[in-house]
UniProtKB/Swiss-Prot annotation:
Family annotation (PROSITE patterns): ATPASE_A
HAMAP family associated with the record: ATP_synth_a_bact
Subunit relationships: F-type ATPases have 2 components, CF(1) - the catalytic core - and CF(0) - the membrane proton channel. CF(1) has five subunits: alpha(3), beta(3), gamma(1), delta(1), epsilon(1). CF(0) has three main subunits: a(1), b(2) and c(9-12). The alpha and beta chains form an alternating ring which encloses part of the gamma chain. CF(1) is attached to CF(0) by a central stalk formed by the gamma and epsilon chains, while a peripheral stalk is formed by the delta and b chains.
Summary of the function given for this chain in its UniProt record: Key component of the proton channel; it plays a direct role in the translocation of protons across the membrane.
Name of the protein: ATP synthase subunit a
Gene Ontology, cellular component aspect: plasma membrane; proton-transporting ATP synthase complex
Keyword line: ATP synthesis, Cell inner membrane, Cell membrane, CF(0), Hydrogen ion transport, Ion transport, Membrane, Transmembrane, Transmembrane helix, Transport
Entry keyword Methyltransferase: no
Localization: Cell inner membrane
Membrane topology, as annotated: Multi-pass membrane protein
Lineage: Bacteria, Pseudomonadati, Pseudomonadota, Alphaproteobacteria, Rickettsiales
KW rRNA-binding (keyword) present: no
Length: 242
């Protein structure tokens, strides 16, 4: 029997908390975000608390992730992006661990919910906007008028560029949430069919599931990378007005 593949995305209250008319209950979503944060902190603490000249495997993996983030900033923002390493690194690691937690049996994919991804996207959007105005003042608004635009075309270009800029949080959040949700739904549906096929084909369908799980892990890592590198691209607009 095929179970509803959308059940895995249900948010459930673990601790019911209400303050006046506001529901601030502790849910499975909050629990997995907290767990992902604690695990990430523990992982990098163990990786870098006692650095060695000949690094351990844990230290190597931590350095790979750190270098990946610094390379993203250097390639997209340049040397001026170094001061943003803590923010971008935290963003990438948080999304990565939340994505990977969804691959654990009976786990919960936090980033499949648009409210979570939109909150992250809004934080990026606000950071970029604040950095742009602090660094360039009102000249930051020149971002909405591409250089060399004819005067008669300027009003239309400003409207288009402004709409594109304001749409960034929506596109950034929808891309991550949609990909994570679609991948897990597909995995759930195919897994249900594989269980049925095993009645007739014994263990032959198992390699298919292993391949699909491996692909979904790749997608989880890729989506964290895409979200972060787009954040770096947007940050470049604020820092260098490109």
């Amino acid at each position: 029997m095929l179970h509803n593949p959308l059940v895995q995305f249900d948010i459930k209250k673990l601790i019911d908390i209400k303050v006046m008319d506001f529901d601030i209950s502790f849910t499975n979503s909050a629990a997995y975000m907290l767990l992902a944060s604690v695990l990430a902190l523990t992982y990098f603490y163990l990786a870098f608390s006692n650095p060695r000249l000949v690094p351990s495997r844990l230290q190597i993996s931590g350095e790979i992730i750190y270098n990946l983030v610094t390379d993203m900033l250097n390639q997209n923002v340049g040397s001026k992006g170094r001061k943003f390493v803590p923010v971008i690194f935290t963003l990438f690691v948080f999304i990565l661990f939340c994505n990977l937690f969804g691959m654990i049996p009976y786990g919960f994919t936090v980033t499949s919910h648009i409210i979570i991804t939109f909150a992250l996207a809004i934080l990026v959007f606000l950071m970029v906007t604040i950095v742009g105005f602090v660094k360039h003042g009102m000249h930051f608004l020149s971002l909405f008028l591409p250089h060399g635009t004819p005067l008669w075309l300027a009003p239309l270009m400003i409207i288009i560029e402004l709409f594109t800029y304001l749409a960034r949080p929506a596109s950034l959040s929808l891309r991550l949430a949609a990909n994570m949700m679609a991948g897990h739904i597909l995995l759930k549906v195919i897994a249900s069919f594989v269980i049925t096929l095993m009645i007739y084909l014994k263990f032959l369908p198992i390699p298919l599931m292993v391949i699909l799980i491996g692909f979904e892990i790749f997608v989880a890592i890729l989506q964290a990378y895409i979200f972060t590198i787009l954040s770096c691209v947007y940050l470049n607009d604020a820092v260098n007005l490109h």
